[in-house]
Regions:
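Helix-loop-strand module that forms the ligand-binding subsite of alpha/beta enzymes
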Residues: 2-73, 78
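Glycine-rich phosphate/pyrophosphate-binding loop and the adjoining helix
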Residues: 66-124
Length: 124
């Protein structure tokens, strides 16, 4: 897994929000790639440099962003940003698909994310 990570120029992670955080399978992936001497040094310097990461999240509700009502229970974004930063990936863009459990409301969120993806693709 580490070799695949190191070989990639761009990383795309699809992560649903489970109980305000990441699913166990994503945590297990992080546990496999966070290795001293491979992705960080013994003095805790990240070794995975020069990579761009896109993190696409799916959430049943909304309001988890800065200044929103459920910001304080969003443990997903800070965790992902911190752990990727720890191994040296600091160029991270989050794309949030919100309200997946709310029928028609999800469409607006999907449209917003599609626009963000198109904008990101035109910059790259």
């Amino acid at each position: 897994m580490i070799d695949e990570l190191l070989a990639a120029d761009v990383l795309v992670f699809g992560i649903p929000m489970y109980n305000f955080s990441v699913p166990a399978v994503f945590k297990a992936y992080i546990d496999q790639i966070a290795r001293v001497g491979r992705t960080f040094t013994s003095s805790y310097e990240g070794l995975v440099k020069g990579k761009k990461a896109f993190v696409v999240t799916a959430r049943g509700g909304g309001g988890y962003g800065p200044g929103e009502p459920r910001e304080t229970v969003n443990f997903e974004d800070p965790y992902v940003k911190s752990v990727l930063g720890f191994i040296g990936i600091t160029d991270v863009t989050f794309l949030h698909i919100n309200n997946t459990a709310r029928g028609e409301e999800v469409q607006a969120s999907l449209n917003q994310v599609r626009t963000q993806i198109k904008e990101a693709a035109s910059v790259s």
